[in-house]
C-alpha cells in the first residue's frame, strides 16, 4: 500500500515540513561522536568487535548511565501523556512478522532463531501490534495508546550497511516506541499527535529538530503515510534521522485480523488502523545529545529534565 500525499521516486524527493528550535553552530570544532564518548571513557568498540563483530558496542560509566537515563525519561514522558507502558516479548512468531511487514523488509531486517518459529524483533512495534492478532475490539476500548521499551535487533542488509566505528547504524540497540490502534476515522489525527510527541521530547532536551515528509517512492510497503524526525548535528551541520512516524492504515490489521465491533451495530465488524512512532532510540539520540550539549572545554551539559535520572548531575566532565 502506498498512498502518500507527496509523490516522488525516492528519499531525495522527501520534503521538509517544519523546523523546531534554532540549529546550534558552535565556534569550535565538534568531534566525532565516538571521540566524545571516548573522552568520558564511555565506549569500547574494540572489545565489542572481538566478542561480536562490527555493529555492536560496550557502553560504560557516565555514557551508559546517560543512555539509560534517556530511556527512563522517555518512558515517563509518554506515561505522562496518557500512554500505557509495556515491556513486550523480544521474539515473535513468523505469522506475526509477516503481518507487520513485507517479505523484503523481513529478509533485510529480521534475525531468525535457528530451528524455531521465532524471530528477534527489529522494533517493539512488531510485538505490540502482534498483541492484537485475531482480536475483536469494542469501539469503546479504542484508541489503544501504548508505549513500549525493547532492545531491537537488525541485520541492516542493504545500501547503507553497518558502521565500522560508530553507533548510528548498528545490529543491536534499545528504543522507546509509541503504538496506537484506533478507529479508521481517528488515524489521521493520531498521526499528527505521534510525531509531535517526538518533537516535544527532543525539544525538552534542547535538541533542534525538523520533520520530513516521506514521498511515495520512499514509503516502505504497507505504509499509508510516514514522516521522519531528524535532529540537528552541529558537527555535520545538517539534520540526520532519529525517528520515524508511520500510519499503516488497515494494512497490518487486515493481515493480522485486528477488527473492531461497531457500538451502534454490534454485528458490524471492520478493520482497525495502526500507527507507530519512535519516541527515542538512544544510540542516535546520544549522538544528537552529545553534539548539541557539548561545551568548548569538552564537558557536556545535562538539561534539567534528565538531571533527576542522572543522580542530580548537571554536567559530564572528561575523565
Mark where each language-model region is.
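Short, small-residue-biased leader/transition segments that mark boundaries at the very start
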Residues: 1-3
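Short, flexible active-site-proximal loops enriched in glycine and acidic residues
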Residues: 5-6, 48
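TRNA-recognition modules of translation machinery and tRNA-sensing kinases, especially anticodon-binding
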Residues: 19-319
Amino acid at each position: 500500500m502506498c498512498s502518500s500525499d507527496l509523490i516522488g521516486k525516492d528519499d531525495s524527493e522527501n520534503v521538509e515540513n517544519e523546523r523546531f528550535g534554532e540549529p546550534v553552530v558552535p565556534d569550535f570544532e565538534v568531534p566525532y561522536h565516538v571521540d566524545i564518548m571516548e573522552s568520558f571513557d564511555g565506549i569500547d568498540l574494540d572489545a565489542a568487535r572481538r566478542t561480536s563483530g562490527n555493529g555492536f558496542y560496550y557502553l560504560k560509566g557516565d555514557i551508559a548511565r546517560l543512555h539509560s537515563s534517556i530511556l527512563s525519561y522517555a518512558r515517563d514522558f509518554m506515561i505522562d501523556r496518557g500512554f500505557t507502558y509495556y515491556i513486550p516479548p523480544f521474539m515473535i512468531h513468523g505469522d506475526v512478522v509477516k503481518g507487520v511487514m513485507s517479505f523484503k523488509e523481513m529478509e533485510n531486517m529480521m534475525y531468525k532463531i535457528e530451528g524455531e518459529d521465532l524471530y528477534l524483533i527489529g522494533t517493539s512495534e512488531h510485538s505490540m501490534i502482534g498483541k492484537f492478532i485475531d482480536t475483536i475490539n469494542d469501539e469503546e476500548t479504542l484508541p489503544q495508546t501504548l508505549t513500549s521499551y525493547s532492545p531491537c535487533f537488525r541485520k541492516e542488509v542493504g545500501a547503507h550497511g553497518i558502521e565500522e566505528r560508530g553507533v548510528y547504524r548498528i545490529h543491536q540497540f534499545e528504543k522507546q516506541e509509541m503504538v496506537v490502534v484506533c478507529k479508521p476515522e481517528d488515524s489521521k489525527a493520531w498521526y499528527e499527535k505521534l510525531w509531535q510527541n517526538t518533537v516535544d521530547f527532543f525539544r525538552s532536551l534542547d535538541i533542534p529538530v525538523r520533520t520530513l515528509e516521506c514521498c511515495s517512492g520512499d514509503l516502505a510497503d504497507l505504509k499509508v503515510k510516514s514522516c521522519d524526525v531528524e535532529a540537528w548535528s552541529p558537527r555535520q551541520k545538517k539534520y540526520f534521522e532519529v525517528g520515524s512516524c508511520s500510519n499503516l492504515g488497515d494494512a497490518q490489521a487486515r493481515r493480522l485480523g485486528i477488527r473492531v465491533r461497531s457500538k451502534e451495530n454490534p454485528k458490524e465488524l471492520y478493520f482497525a488502523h495502526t500507527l507507530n512512532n519512535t519516541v527515542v532510540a538512544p544510540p542516535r539520540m546520544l549522538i544528537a545529545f552529545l553534539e548539541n550539549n557539548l561545551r568548548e572545554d569538552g564537558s557536556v551539559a545535562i538539561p534539567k529534565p534528565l538531571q533527576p535520572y542522572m543522580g542530580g548531575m548537571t554536567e559530564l566532565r572528561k575523565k
